[in-house]
Amino acid sequence: MNCVVIPAYRAAGSILSVIEAVGPEIELIVVVDDGCPEGTGVVVANRCSDPRVVTLMHDANQGVGGAFLTGMRYAIVRGADIIIKVDADGQMDPAQVPALIHPIASGQADYVKGDRFFFLTNSASMPPVRRFGNLALSFLAKLSSGYWTIMDPTNGFFAIHARVAELLDDERIAKRFFFETDLLFHLGLIRAKVVEFPMRASYGNEVSNLRVSHQLGPFLAGHMRNTTRRILYRYFFRDLSLASLQLVAGGVLFLFGLVFGLYHWWAAPPDQLVPTGTIMIAALTFLMGFQLVLSFLNYDISASPREPLHPFLKGWQAKAADEGRNAAASYVAPERVRREA
């Protein structure tokens, strides 16, 4: 079963048209009203007659990530196989869902996300501030997630296999604007295969709830934290390889050469030349360290997951899936559930 989850906040004017555009390949549509002051969930419950639609209500706003994770958990207990996130503002075309989920349905990927940078004309139509921010965040996301071929990390149009979703520690995933990027980091920890889907986004008159000045600090802090956690977990806790030694030795030599060279350059009298031996020590250690760090990065880039994970999870998760389906009828959550035809 395929399920679409639509986090909804201040989307009362667009949500019905988004639901109407969802094709017949989707058996379940979960709309999560994330404490919307416009009552988007009430609008859906009272005015939408689509029998596939279920509305979940958050009493308080939890962010786009919190809303999706609520819908994801509900979809899993309902027995969904593939879970798709579609935003409620109409920026994403639900008609593209069949192409989006094809790599997962055919066993080629665990997670598929949209890429708005694939088409140059579409990228040029992106607002300049948004384009620059996404390009900068793309590089940081490569470093923090380990998916070096992935662009557009903040794209919210994605699909994930339910078996892989069950492996995620959703309590530790960021709930607000860092959600999509943090999700990539957690997918990297379990070595899920991620591929991109070329898409065209529509930038209309919708008003973004993102305030760049407020989120810049949390985004940078989140990337630094995730980069540190990923490297420690991947190269020191889970495994110890030549790349681990390259990183340690390279980091030590690089920093030693840099600090040693700067110190002697600063401390040298202006009328005296720095001894050749001192220059050689600083230069050689700096260059050796730099080369070792480059070797580590080359290994890290080549180590991106290449095999999908979910085909290997079918056996040991079968029992859990049966229990989930049995629990669907008595699903209890801190959110109110409303369904009206």
Regions picked out by a protein language model, each given a short descriptive name:
Residues I173-A174, F178-A341:
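Hydrophobic helical membrane-anchoring modules
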Residues C3-P7, V30, M57:
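Short hydrophobic beta-strand elements that form part
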Residues G13-S17, E38-R47:
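Acidic helix N-cap motif at the loop->helix transition within catalytic regions
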Residues V54, H58-V77, I82, P94-F177, ...:
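Acceptor/aglycone-binding surface of glycosyltransferases and processive sugar-polymer synthases
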Residues N2-C3, D182:
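Cell-envelope/extracellular polymer assembly enzymes that use nucleotide-activated donors
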Residues I6-P24:
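Short, well-formed alpha-helical segments that are part of the catalytic scaffolds
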Residues D33-V42, A60, G90:
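A conserved acidic beta->alpha catalytic loop
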